[in-house]
Amino acid sequence: MRYPFFAMVCFCVLIAPSRAADAPYVTTPQNVIDAMLKISKVAAADYVIDLGSGDGRVVITAAKSLGARGMGVELDANLVRTATRNAQREGVQDRVSFYKDDLFFADLSKATVITMYMSESVNLRLRPSLFKLKPGTRVVSHDFDMAQWTPDEKMTVPVPNKPYGQPKSDIFLWVVPADFSGAWTWRIPIAGINQEHEARFEQKFQVAEGKGRVASRAVPVGNVQIRGDTISFVMGATVDGKTTWRDFRGRISDDTITGSVFTVVEGDAVNKSQEPVVWRATRTARGKMIIDAATEFVDEDKVAALFLTKEQQ
């Protein structure tokens, strides 16, 4: 169902950090908001925080259409008052709230979903704060990415009457990854003998590489995947002349992983040759997840060009 109130949306777009206080509004159609909420899978259990919330329509849409709760962070006190009135008018004042605050200092800890429409340079300044959020928190950005932190998902929606750039909008989704870096140990049976396993992982954003050892022998580790607090990887070993791959899947909580391991023997007719067994690993040494933006470059001329009107282009 469509609501006239949500026909068009104005986002506070931060062209550069120095302009955060006087950023212009750019009109955004409802289909972009719908796509942002869809790609981040917003549901009634979520708490949505919109950074640069303007008149509040992203959070209000999430509350009215999807039953979510949330808040907006906005520097302009007049817009905060407008957003509060709009929430009352739409009957969601008990589910949403709006605050005048600097987005770089706002408390984001309650968020399960962060929405934003800011320049890449501002995104990069925000990135360290986003990595402090609980693993699994979804971050969705309209039109601007986060340089070396590649999105987990991306979609493009048509915007025929967009007042700047191309007649489309890119929407990026990131899932805040758990810190999987460091050394992990565990024991599982191999050929009937409980064997000591060790794996060491280096991680940059949600991408990791590992090296493994089984009973002091080096073994390959590959296909490492991290999404929120869930991880998976495979570890190889040779047993009775056959290559055996173990598929580890689990969930991280601080320095512990709990999950299951499947065993696949090379040449088996079936994909999983054994029933999964419980797997529990302990981190014995912490690493350092790399999230440094110091070497990343943002082309502000390119950013500014995106906001040229059709008449200016």
Regions found by a protein language model. Give the residues of each.
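Conserved alpha-helix/loop element of class I SAM-dependent methyltransferases that forms part
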Residues: 27-45
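Conserved class I S-adenosyl-L-methionine
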Residues: 44-54
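Glycine-rich SAM-binding Motif I of class I
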Residues: 56-60
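Conserved SAM-binding motif I beta-strand of class I
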Residues: 69-74
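S-adenosyl-L-methionine
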Residues: 77-110
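A short SAM/SAH-binding and catalytic strip from SAM-dependent methyltransferases
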Residues: 109-125
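C-terminal substrate-binding/active-site "lid" region of AdoMet-derived donor-dependent transferases
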Residues: 123-179
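Central antiparallel beta-sheet cores of small beta-barrel/beta-sandwich binding domains
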Residues: 178-277, 299-310
